[in-house]
């Protein structure tokens, strides 16, 4: 996996780059300027937990969010089983799932409603099988809480980080420590846990070869 500092003010994530993990600041209510997802999707599912908390839902947030994640997992598993039956020549008809872009915004908030077990099950299915069955998932993290399965999330094809995060967030998700040491600088000793080297519009990117 290569790590680089993207200074061209834009990062475009194409289908081959999924699943993608976006690390951004907690006070950001919109996608970073210059960051784009390039997927020709038939459907888009944006699970915006903060918006759901603000506007409310007909059911409890635990039920609402849990059911959305369960539906996605069930859909991927169903197509995986269909593909297996086709491979065994039990089914002749070729069934291709529609392309779905899924944005989980944000994963740290989702955890609060589905718990560790639910989140781990969802991530495992999506990271291993989602893209294979046309489910392209972007995981957004705005607060790197201790309970997040970081080692599992590092299996994402692409990791993109914006400026001004806590220094430990970068070191948790990016393995090239020597490279990080050369680019992560602090502006003030009173804020030694805050990285201020990046200019607005720059991105730290890691992609699997």
Each model region followed by its residue ranges:
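Loop/turn-to-beta-strand initiation segments
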Residues: 18-19, 41-44, 96-101, 131-138
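Conserved P-loop NTPase motor module
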Residues: 1-23, 30-45, 49-51, 67-75, ...
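Conserved ATP-driven motor cores of ASCE-family P-loop NTPases powering translocation/secretion/packaging/pilus
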Residues: 120-209
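Secondary-structure capping and boundary motifs in well-ordered enzyme cores
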Residues: 96-99, 103, 115, 119-122, ...
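Walker B catalytic acidic pair
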Residues: 105-109
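Switch/connector loops and helix/strand junctions flanking conserved nucleotide-binding motifs
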Residues: 30-32, 55-56, 110-112, 147-149, ...
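Short, polar loop motifs at secondary-structure junctions
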Residues: 25-28, 144-145
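Conserved helicase/translocase P-loop NTPase motor core
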Residues: 45-100, 110-115
């Amino acid at each position: 996996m290569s790590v680089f500092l993207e200074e061209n003010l834009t990062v475009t994530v194409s289908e081959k780059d999924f699943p993608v993990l976006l690390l951004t600041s907690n006070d950001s209510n919109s996608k970073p300027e210059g960051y784009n997802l390039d997927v020709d999707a038939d459907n888009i599912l944006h699970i915006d937990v903060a918006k759901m908390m603000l506007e409310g839902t007909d059911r409890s947030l635990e039920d609402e969010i849990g059911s959305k994640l369960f539906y996605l997992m069930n859909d991927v598993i169903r197509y995986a089983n269909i593909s297996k039956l086709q491979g065994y020549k039990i089914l002749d008809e070729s069934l291709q799932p529609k392309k779905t872009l899924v944005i989980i915004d944000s994963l740290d908030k989702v955890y609060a409603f589905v718990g560790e077990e639910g989140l781990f099950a969802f991530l495992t299915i999506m990271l291993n099988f989602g893209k294979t069955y046309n489910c392209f998932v972007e995981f957004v993290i705005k607060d790197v809480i201790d309970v997040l399965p970081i080692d599992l999330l590092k299996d994402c094809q692409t990791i993109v980080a914006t400026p001004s995060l806590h220094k430990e967030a970068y070191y948790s998700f990016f393995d090239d420590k020597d490279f990080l040491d050369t680019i992560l600088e602090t502006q003030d000793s009173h804020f030694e846990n805050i990285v201020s080297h990046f200019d607005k519009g720059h991105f730290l990117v890691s992609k699997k070869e």
